[in-house]
Amino acid sequence: MQKLLLILTILLALILITLVISLPRENQQFFSETRSTIGKSGYWETNFFKKIILLIVSILLFLTLIFYMIQTA
């Protein structure tokens, strides 16, 4: 059981790294006015499906690590 959890954790981590690398970088504008961003797409509107998959994989990795910690305690 522990080998399976370890392999699953490694696979989820590699998938998570690949997804993060494949996403384009977002521009950060700390100094701009709020009026200048009106009409521009929000964070979730660009690459929506990649970001949803990234969110799901990170939650699965977190839950797998929690379960692995419970099993080994």
Swiss-Prot record:
Pfam families associated with the record: Asp5
Topology of this chain in the membrane: Single-pass membrane protein
Signal peptide residue numbers: 1-30
Gene Ontology BP annotations: protein transport
InterPro entries (alphabetical): Asp5
Cellular component annotations (GO), alphabetically ordered: plasma membrane
Membrane-crossing residue ranges in chain numbering: 52-72
Keyword Transmembrane: yes
Assembly and interaction partners: Part of the accessory SecA2/SecY2 protein translocation apparatus required to export cell wall protein GspB.
Function: Part of the accessory SecA2/SecY2 system specifically required to export GspB, a serine-rich repeat cell wall protein encoded upstream in the same operon.
Protein known as: Accessory secretory protein Asp5
Organism: Streptococcus gordonii
